[in-house]
Amino acid sequence: MMRHLLLVGAAILIFVSDAQAQGDGEDPCQIVRCSYGANCIAYGDTAICECPFGYSGIRCQDPS
């Protein structure tokens, strides 16, 4: 799984996952579940988790 780290503002880390929807119009945020109240943003067929301050990881699962 390929990961890219983007720094947005001073406190929000966004991890881009290459999780792909199944091609049937399924929302990728239904496949990739973000943790700790992180927001999931569907960008095409890719899910992006916007981690709250203090969390990191593809799905914001790691306290930082």
UniProtKB/Swiss-Prot annotation:
Residue ranges constituting the EGF-like domain according to the UniProt record: 25-61
Main localization of the protein described in the UniProt heading: secreted
Alphabetically ordered keywords of this record: Disulfide bond, EGF-like domain, Growth factor, Pyrrolidone carboxylic acid, Secreted, Signal
Residue list for modification Pyrrolidone carboxylic acid: 22
Residue pairs linked by disulfide bridges in the UniProt entry: 29-40, 34-49, 51-60
UniProt-recorded Gene Ontology molecular function terms: growth factor activity
Keyword Protein biosynthesis assigned: no
GO (cellular component) term, any one: extracellular region
Subcellular location: Secreted
PROSITE patterns recorded: EGF_1 (PS00022), EGF_2 (PS01186), EGF_3 (PS50026)
Highest taxon above the source species: Eukaryota
Tissues in which the UniProt entry reports expression: Albumen gland. Up-regulated in adult CNS after axotomy.
Pfam families found in the cross-reference section: EGF
InterPro entries (UniProt xref): EGF-like_dom (IPR000742)
Keyword Cytoplasm: no
Signal peptide: 1-21
Residues annotated as transmembrane: none
Job description of the protein: Induces neurite outgrowth in specific adult neurons in vitro.
Protein known as: Epidermal growth factor
Source organism of this protein record: Lymnaea stagnalis (Great pond snail)
Classification lineage: Eukaryota, Metazoa, Spiralia, Lophotrochozoa, Mollusca
